[in-house]
Amino acid sequence: MAEPPADVIALAQQRADARAARDFAAADRLRDEIAATGWVVTDAPGGGFTITPKPPYDVLASIRDLPDNSEQPDTHRATVSVLVDGWPDDVRTCVEALLTHTAADVVVQALDLGNVDGAGDALHEMRGDRLQEWHVAGPAGWSDARNALLRAETARVHVWCDLSTVFTGDALSPLLDAIDADDAVVAAGWRGVNVDLADEWRSFVPAPAGDVDAILGYLFAMRRSAALAAGGPHPKARFYRNADMEFSFALREAVPGARLVVPPGELPCRQDRHRGYSDSDPAYRDKESAKTYNRFLQRFRGRTDLLAPREDGG
């Protein structure tokens, strides 16, 4: 990689000094001045900064710079939303499959968080009319990123897709059809789970097709209006795990009589390595997962009115 010239390094140091003095207006001005020279400065964890060549796409300073279109009317049928935080080969596999196996009225929306290992570059390789790409300079928590994408788009149905979920055919249309079939259906997904009442809400169990208590975030389609009414995922959910189940119940609470369903039959998709679980720091993963589940219990435990109907009537 080319080394930045001395004058750019000097500007970056001035920016770091301005940030330390909390002169953020000056820091922003210096950041833009650096960008005009063809370089990008990024704050490093624990202090300091890195300087890299400016990529062939716009990079926003943070997810707060994404547009807020939450008050705008629906403009198309669905948007499939993907978070990109590394693993460029996974990005290519997942996004190419989405573009290949979804209809022309479906937009694929991806948020690149810091171009980790060139994942943002891999995303940009697939640019086109149906790919809406956002690039920000650094990382963001799971909920913050998901909420930014929800507010930025204007589809009738907003879809979470994990990078580990790879379409082998049109796995989206059955979910959209399930939502279209009944106004009470606010969400449909690939895999559903039910609260284990025998375990006093301390766990969930896999659910068969039909009405379910919660949908897992591997592939989770939701009415945008319902997702916005629920306030999006909880702002304290910094990690994905258990946040999908928490949000499922938030949808139910926000929309009286809401149904969440898994359509019958096997969807044409597969799950590759789930990086969020398998390649995250175990201590961080377990800590944040427990925080989210405890928050779920505090808010929803005992709310049997929010459960899907059981075959035994319970």
Residues covered by each model-derived region:
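C-terminal, non-catalytic tails of nucleotide-sugar-dependent glycosyltransferases
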Residues: I63-T75, V186-G189, N194-R202, G210, ...
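A recurrent flexible, glycine/aromatic-enriched loop bordering the glycosyltransferase active site
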Residues: F204-M222, Y240
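A conserved acidic beta->alpha catalytic loop
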Residues: L111-D121
